[in-house]
Structure formats: C-alpha cells, structure tokens
A protein has these predicted regions:
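Positively charged n-region of N-terminal signal peptides that target proteins for export
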Residues: 1-5
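Bacterial N-terminal signal peptides
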Residues: 7-17
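Metal-cofactor-binding active-site regions of metalloenzymes
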Residues: 23-468
Length: 468
C-alpha cells in the first residue's frame, strides 16, 4: 500500500472518528481511491476533474487524422497509394488516389489514418520504429496544415474545454514559413548583431505582421464556428488561448536564428504570442551539432528581449538514440543556464546529465517546471514505470504539469495523461490537483490574466469537490 493511501485513510478515519464530515477535497480524494480500479468510473472522474491547462501542445500534432483527411478532400488533394500520405494533385488513379476515396473506401481510410498517426503501428522492414513513424506522420499531413488553422484551432480548443481545461498554449509558426523563406537568401555570420540587423532590414517586420494577421483570421474563423457571443456558444469560447512561436531547430543555422528573432519580435508585438520554443527531433544532425550555438543565440536575443518567455524541448533523448556523450552533454542544464528556459519540455535524459542531483536541485530551486508528456513518453519513447522520469522529478521537488504533446498523432488526450498518472504512478488526488494548479501557475500570461485563471480554477475545483 502506498504512503499517500495510508495517510489518506488515517486522515479520513480521524475526521470521521471526531464526528465531523470530511471536507470536500477529502471526499474527492476518497472517491478517486474508490474508483481507481474501476476503469469506467475512473475515466468519468478524471474527465470531469478540472485540469487547468495544457502547456506543451503542438497544433499540427494535436489534430486527428480524420480531420486531415477531410481537409484533403476539401482541397482536392490526393493520397499516395504506397505511403498513404496526403500529396498534391493531379491524382492518376494508380500511384496517387483522389482523397475523396478515403471517404467511401473503408480500407483506404484506415490505412491513411494509420499513416497520419501511430494507431495500429506494427514494425515492418520499411517502418520499423514507432518514433520514426511518429515523426514521419507530420510529413504525411503537412500539405494540408497551413490552409485550415480556423478548423484546427476549433478542434483542439473544443476538445480541451470539453475536458475541463481552461487554458491552452499551442505551438505553431504564425508566419507559415515566411521567415524561413526570407532567411534563405541571407548568408551566415557569427556576428549575431550584424545578422539580426540584416534580417530586420530584409523584411522581418512584414513577416511578423503577417503572422499576427494569420492568427486574427484563424481566431475569427474559430469563434465563428463556435458561435461565440450567442446562446448556442460552444464550450470552447470560454478557454483562454495563447501561442508559442515554434523554431524548427533542424534547419540551417541562419534559418534557426531568423525564426528565433521572429519569435522574439512577435512576442513583443502581439500579446497572444507568449513564448518561443525549439521543436523537431533533438537527435537530428543540426539539432545536435548546433545545440551550443542555438543556446548562445537564445542568450543573445534574451538580452535584447528580456521580457519574452522561453520554454524549450530539452533532454528529449534516450539511450541508444545517440552516443553516450550526447546524453552527458547537459542539454537540460544548458537550456536553463544558457538558453534561459523557464520551463522544460520532456526532460527525459535527466539521469544522464553530469551531476544530475545538482541539476535537479537547481531546477527545484529556480522553480523550472517540467512539461511531462506521459503518453508520448510511454508509447513513443517506451519509457514506462521505473524508466519514466515523472517519479524522479516528483521525488526531487521539481514542479510538474501534465501535457498532451501531439494528441492527434498519438490518439490520446489530457484525460488519458491524468489516468496514466493514476494507474501507472499511483498519483493521488492532491498530486493531480497540483499538476492542474501548476499548469496555471507556470502559464506564460500577464499577471491579471493569471489571477483570473487561478480564481476560475479554484471555483471549478470547489464545484467538482462539492459533487461528492
């Protein structure tokens, strides 16, 4: 029997023995203990439970494959008959099939869904690793992502709000690649000040303004779909939505710096963009080779834009993926000390950092939140039970929030992550409640918005606990 369960039982016994009804939070905790072995009751409990927010969320990875098939049909695109990826027309009917066939051909539809996600993944000679299949899925649906932001936002915001989330930070590229195209004609120089000046003069302001307009259009389309302001308003109208500017770290260094600069500029100009983040697989060649340079870039830009928040994918590496020296390279520590990360996503290789106890102590002291993506860690990285880092961070008092990462590709949601915490790591009700509170406490919003979100979360918990 776990220590939290013993303490809970003693607390309830003392309370009842004194003739006093247990407090609402105690009743909710007791209910979780009662239903943890009853899947149908546990899921209902966790679905209704307030979860705060999702701080690690990739927009394109959060949309389900069925939606991407719909976009491909709407756009007149094709399906590659061998890879089942969405490709450009014309469709020849043999090597490439009209996407409309995925609406009527059940077998084809299921092949496409499996290609655009990790559903039904089984290793094969041409597709032998779930992690590689996971990243390949993004290429398979990439063609239809930029033209459907309103629908995509509507899908993920509704899903979050329907699970009793009140806040979402999602990662995207607001300028839709305009900055990457701009940087293609700019030569690299180690003089970051000169490079910044060149990029600003090359049209960065236009790209940033275009990014804000893209968000305007997408949000207006989302609100229209939600019928916000009417009696038929969708539950998603009440969710607070913010964005992280994602930087593709596997690109050439001039492109990476240009994206970083655009992210800092946009966060300064548009309050909806609250942070920048580096994305793409961390074992990509440029991501590994240029990691120290990327941190220096962030350090340089942080000094110019000190009020812009930074959260970084860090330590998303596991033994066997890379040489041991890369695991020992203290990517997590460097992301915090040099890259100025206030939050860390994943943090899987913490035990391999040199002097890991000191790094963990530093994270606890500085209140560096770890965005723990339980589902992707377990299913994509095969890190379960003792191999998972969640207990390590909890044991060392590092703040944690649970996040979905790419719920569309992994076919999951935030409720699933909370359920995994309960079933796989014996998380009790106070721990789950702390996860939810941390997601608001460490959210990158202004003080007034944070106070409002915290008050709303308190009220949501009061209503939830009063139901038991």
């Amino acid at each position: 029997v776990s220590v939290p369960r013993i303490l809970l039982a003693l607390a309830l016994a003392c309370t009842l023995g004194a003739g006093v009804a247990p407090a609402p939070a105690q009743r909710a905790a007791a209910e979780l203990q009662r239903v943890r072995s009853r899947p149908e009751l546990l899921h209902d409990f966790l679905l209704r439970m307030p979860k705060g927010g999702d701080l690690h969320h990739h927009l394109t990875g959060a949309v389900y494959a069925e939606s991407y098939i719909g976009y491909a049909i709407e756009d007149g695109d094709c399906i590659d008959a061998s890879t089942f990826a969405i490709v450009a027309p014309p469709c020849d009917g043999k090597a490439t099939l009209p996407a409309t066939q995925a609406a009527s051909n059940f077998v084809l539809r299921n092949h496409v869904i499996d290609a655009l996600s990790i559903r039904n993944f089984h290793p094969s000679p041409l597709d032998e690793d779930v992690r590689l299949h996971f990243f390949a899925a993004f290429d398979a649906f990439d063609r239809v992502t930029n033209g459907h932001w309103a629908e995509m936002l509507a899908e993920v915001v509704h899903r979050a709000a329907a699970q009793n989330e009140i806040y979402l930070e999602t990662m995207l590229t607001p300028d839709q690649g305009e900055v990457i195209r701009l940087a293609a004609g700019v030569p690299w120089t180690n003089d970051l000040g000169a490079l910044r000046a060149t990029l600003l003069a090359a049209g960065m302001a236009k790209a940033v303004a275009d990014g804000s307009r893209n968000l305007d259009v997408a949000e207006a389309g989302m609100r229209q779909r939600f019928a916000c302001g009417t009696r038929a308003a969708d539950v998603g109208c009440g969710l607070t939505l913010r964005y992280q500017y994602q930087v593709l770290r596997a690109f050439p260094r001039v492109s990476v710096f240009a994206q970083m600069l655009a992210g800092f500029e946009m966060a300064r100009a548009d309050r909806r963009v609250v942070a920048i983040n580096l994305v793409q697989s961390q074992d990509e060649y440029n991501a590994l080779a240029d990691f120290p340079l990327h941190m220096r870039m962030l350090d340089y830009l942080h000094r110019i834009y000190p009020d812009v928040h930074i959260t970084l994918h860090a330590g998303e590496l596991t033994p066997g993926e890379v040489k041991p020296e890369e695991l020992w390279a203290n990517h997590i520590e460097q992301s915090i000390d040099v890259g100025h990360a206030e939050r860390v996503g994943h943090g899987l290789d913490i035990v391999y950092e040199r002097n890991a106890p000191a790094v963990l102590a530093m994270m606890a002291r500085k209140h560096i939140l770890v965005e723990d993506c339980l589902y992707s860690h377990e299913v994509v990285r095969d890190m379960r039970g003792r191999d998972n880092v969640l207990p390590i961070y909890l044991r060392n008092h590092v703040p944690i929030s649970l996040a979905t990462d790419d719920e569309g590709v992994t076919r999951s949601d935030l409720t699933d992550s909370f359920e995994r915490a309960v079933l796989g790591y014996s998380a009790d009700y106070p721990t789950l409640k702390t996860f939810a509170r941390n997601s608001i406490r460490y959210a990158f919003v202004d003080a007034q918005t944070k106070r409002a979100l915290e008050a709303r979360l308190d009220a949501d918990f009061a209503r939830f606990e009063a139901s038991f």
